[in-house]
Amino acid sequence: MITGELKNKIDSLWDIFAAGGLVNPLEVIEQITYLMFIHDLDDSDNIRAKESAMLGLPYQSIFSDEVKIGERTIDGSQLKWSVFHDFPADRMYSVMQEWVFPFIKTLHSDKNSAYSKYMDDAIFKLPTPLVLSKVVDSLDEIYKMMNEIQTADVRGDVYEYLLSKIAQSGLNGQFRTPRHIIRMMVEMMDPSSEEVICDPACGTSGFLVASGEYLKEKKKEEIFFDKQKKDHYMNHMFHGYDMDRTMLRIGAMNMMTHGIDNPFIEYRDSLSDQNPDKDKYSLVLANPPFKGSLDAESVSGDLLKVCKTKKTELLFLSLFLRILKIGGRCACIVPDGVLFGSSKAHKDIRKEIVENQRLEAVISMPSGVFKPYAGVSTAILIFTKTEHGGTDDVWFYDMTADGFSLDDKRSPIAENDIPDIIERFKNPDKEADRKRTDKSFMVPKQDIVNNDYDLSINKYKEVEYVAVEYPPTYEIMTNIREIEMEIGKEMDELENLLNL
């Protein structure tokens, strides 16, 4: 999590935009995102150059030699943040407006790429050289503080804090999945170098970015020393859809900044007939929106065949089952109501997953996980698409701590179940003998069937009560009499003092 000092610095950056006349949170976050992307291009270009040198691979810097922008050819080094941030305000503004911004819009010549789709209509909106100069100085200070914190999540945490401004403004109702929860889900699924990964409600591409980072960390040599696997990683592995173009633009830049050149990020209503995907993906990672009900006419008919409902959280589960290949896996976040809802649609989708697919795990999370943006209680469902059943014993885990306080402050604390969750999930043989009073335990499929496919952990968890021994009744009564006598004595003394 980011420090209070860093939050204050981001708030100050936001105030610079407001003072310059940019007050729409969506516009502000777009402009900040562009500038962060320009800053990160410089850093990531340097990192890639070093990585290529270490691996003995050739690398062509995007800033090397001369760069053509429109009809003009300029020195590419002037496009680097580390160079132009020292320019006088007027010159910096001119370079940014005339060179840097047009340059980032043309980084991908492939007009079908995610980056090109969502940068084509990007506009540089900072009004004056003075505002740009102040914003660049402020971002330099923010990056300096981020580097001092030196945690892998700090950049993502800054992004989350920026996105919280949208939520606070009441626009779009955006709130992000915490990065440590995303990372936990990715580690549990342990994606391979051959996965085809999809998030049908991708937002800023958090799950896709985390999957890419995990693969680079765990399977770097396997992917980057194999031409076909590297091509798959860069161009075919990652698929994300959303209905918010601002989020898609941020998501596309987020992916590219993390070294994924050409993810398939597309504007799409995943629940409508506009989405043709079927039996396509090997892994779905998602935290779909729980925004209530949809217009039934806008929902794809085949999703309603599994469970006839207007509730998005149920329809997305139906969608996951449709878009997964046989053998494909899913880890998704659902509101608690999905686990125990008594409507026919709730029971139908749970029955479908338990009876016709293979439900593997239900991880109950505390309601504070999404604070300060939302207080909803949620759980993680993990299942595999089989179309012929296979559910045996289902693993339940009762998460009570995630390393942060569960209030609005979300301050770091020592208690953290996440390492234990990952360890236990990856070693199922050790789980079979656990009692239902433990943090985790197995529940046979038949127990779930007998309970109307209820998947809430409290339905199966047992509480161990410790017997309390009280003294005999006569002893308690004697103590009460003694207390009464003491009270009477004190009352007599008080009356004497008051001359009553």
Map each language-model feature to its residues.
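Hydrophobic alpha-helical scaffolding
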Residues: 148, 201, 240-244, 283, ...
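C-terminal, active-site-flanking charged/polar segments
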Residues: 358-359, 371-421
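Conserved nucleotide-binding/hydrolysis micro-motifs of P-loop NTPases
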Residues: 42, 204, 246, 272, ...
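Short beta-alpha connecting loops at secondary-structure transitions
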Residues: 236-239, 268, 299-305, 364-366, ...
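Short acidic (Asp/Glu) and glycine-rich catalytic loops that position anionic groups and cofactors
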Residues: 11, 137, 231, 261-265, ...
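Conserved S-adenosyl-L-methionine
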Residues: 172-286, 291-295, 301-302, 310, ...
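Conserved Class I SAM-dependent methyltransferase catalytic core
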Residues: 28, 32, 243-250, 265, ...
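Non-catalytic, mostly N-terminal accessory regions of nucleic-acid modification and defense proteins
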Residues: 1-193, 264-275, 364-368, 391-405, ...
